[in-house]
Amino acid sequence: MKIHLLKMSEQQPTDYAFPEKARRASNTSAPSQKRRDQEDLNRRPSFFGRVPAIVWSGAMAFVLAVGTGGIWTVLLTSNLATSPAIPWSVAVMALFLWTMWQYLGGRWWPRSTSQARRRYLRARSLPGRVFAWAVAAGLLSTIALVGYWIVLLQVVKIPTRVLPNFFSYPPLTAILVLIMASLVSSLAEEASFRGYFLGTLEQRMSGPVAIVIAALLISPGHSLTQGFLWPIMLWYFFSDVTFGAMAYLTKSILPSALVHSIGLLIFFTLVWPYDAQRRQIWETGANTGFWIAAVSAIIFTVLALLAFIQLALVAKQRKP
């Protein structure tokens, strides 16, 4: 009995007997989330250390977006000039876009970069509620942007963009070309700028700053086709901020890619073909169409902002 009691006394006291000591030990052995966040922040490189990654990512995004559009332009021009009845350019471009999307999403060589490519593309599926609010916010913004565009062309003198009259070609060619034209710019821009580039920026700075930088970088790309005019660049800046906000809040480019494609299809068919007919208000006065566009732009801007607020709430709720 004495031997047993002696052994019991030689054992180290348990932490249950000293709760304060156990709590201190727990705090020292498992750093708090705040401390881990601070340590992660301290490990981040300085601003000059971040620049190379940002520069390379931005350059890649710009080349990919502009280059993809250039490839489509060459294919389409050749197709319409040689055999407009057979829309072979659409098939070739579809294969190119599929290959691009697969590679950016992590397929094929090199395997060592597969996970990184998949992560940076950010083509993640979303819960139905988050996806629905993201699409709603994007579509409401698109309607507002249509109104602002119509108002802009009647307030500021801007050289109008002359588009090919696709409806003068065979119906099948016209329909397929318009659909592909809407997909080319949207998929390339969303993958490169709202996927790779914005994802890189978000790791190194706040979300709003990252959205603005990404929108500023793509502006010259839009100006290559629309002209280097400040009203046009400002309009495109806000449209790019819209898509950037969708990608930032959802951490996915799927909603913005869908809305971007729908928006381009609307502009290709209902807006841009009629730009040449719009006259400045100081020449003809503000007609009914002008006021409808102006009021619609304001109303749908408010609705879009409310939808984005709701999107931010539902997106935050799904995070663990």
Language-model-derived ranges and their functions:
Residues K2-R44:
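Low-complexity, intrinsically disordered extramembrane tails and loops of integral membrane proteins
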Residues I54-Q115, W133-A134, V295-I298:
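Alpha-helical transmembrane segments in multi-pass membrane proteins
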Residues V55, A59, F131-A136, I175-I179, ...:
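Hydrophobic alpha-helical transmembrane segments
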Residues V66, P231-A286:
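Functionally important transmembrane alpha-helices
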Residues L75-I86, Q115-A188, Q203:
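Juxtamembrane helix-loop-helix connectors linking adjacent transmembrane helices
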Residues A188-I213, Y248-S252:
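Membrane-interface helix/loop boundary segments of multi-pass membrane proteins
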Residues H222-W230:
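Membrane-interface helix caps and helix-loop-helix hairpins in membrane proteins
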Residues S261-P320:
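C-terminal membrane module of polytopic membrane proteins
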